Amino acid sequence: MHAFLVILFMIVIGALIGGITNIIAIKMLFHPQRAYHIGKWRIPFTPGLVPKRREEIAYKIGNVIEEHLITESLIKEKISSLSAREAIESFITQQIQKLKKDNATLQNFAGYFGIDLAKTAEDKLSNLIDEKLAQYYQDHNQEPLKSLIPSELEVELDEKIEALTPLLCDRARIYLSSAKGEQDIYNMLDTFFAEKGKIIGLLQMFMTKENIAERIQMELIRLTNHPKAREIVAQLINNEYMTLKNKSLGGVVSPEQFNNIKEKFTPLILSYADISARVNQPIKDLAPSIVKYAEQHAATWTTNLIVEKAAEHLSSIMKQVNLSGIVEEQINSFDLDYIERLIIEIANKELKLIMLLGFLLGGIIGCLQGIIALFV
């Protein structure tokens, strides 16, 4: 009986020593949180392991996460996976459908950035037109018009000029043959007689004004059909046309005239462009073909582009993000009590097993000591 009590006592003492030692060891991982000194001598094991090595632990954890857990190759693999592609493509498709349903406009997108798209676009377009016109005038104002006219347009103008003589003569004949033409000739003849007085009155002794007007009308009509008259008209028109083509742009349009033209031309272009109406028009109505194409191809194309560009620039992105640095900084910012709670929550079961193992090993060692003590 005495031997049994001795062994039991040694088991209890050993278990208590082993268990309490492990409990203290676990506590010493986190406590004390600062160093204690006796004079200049620092008490051993202060601060605890975690407070003392927190920066080193944070650095190591950050490196482990970046080099072994969230690696560049792993992220590339996940981004390129079928599930990731399907998720991205599904999201893009949903957004396109949402744009159609919500009647989204270009101004809606610009509004997210605080931009008045209509005013901005009009200002940009107005400045661009003014700059281009001014630059064109400055570069070409000494050049002849014929060098500035496109060859196709020049050919067409030449054809129009050639057709101008018959047209003018035919119109003149029609006018002279009309009642208005006849009346205008009579009125001019009446004015002419009134100005010339008695000398012209002698003609009226042989012919009446009506006869004279009729003869003049007939001669003018005959003149419009005469080949020589038409040749003279054609030559005059062609001479003026060639003179105009050989003039410089600056000789035809002065700087003041150009500025006046520009001031009227730019607002005219802007009014035809009607930018305000276009940027506030639903995109599905503004560019239905683009929306249709986007529905059919944009999701797949954009997904491929996102995956390719993400993989291409992932290395530089990860360097700029500095994942290990973020983890290290975050861990260093945690309160020590929070780190203790976090570790205990994660390893609670294992820590309890360690404490139980301490009691068990202590008990076994105590039992062995008790047995040895009986035989010594």
From Swiss-Prot:
Record-annotated membrane-spanning stretches: 4-24, 356-376
Its membrane topology: Multi-pass membrane protein
InterPro entries xrefs: DUF445 (IPR007383), UCP032178 (IPR016991)
Top-level taxon in the UniProt lineage: Bacteria
Coiled coil spans: none
Cellular component annotations (GO), alphabetically ordered: plasma membrane
Compartments, record wording: Cell membrane
Keywords from the UniProt entry: Cell membrane, Membrane, Transmembrane, Transmembrane helix
Family to which the UniProt record says this protein belongs: Belongs to the UPF0754 family.
Annotated protein name in UniProt: UPF0754 membrane protein Sca_1420
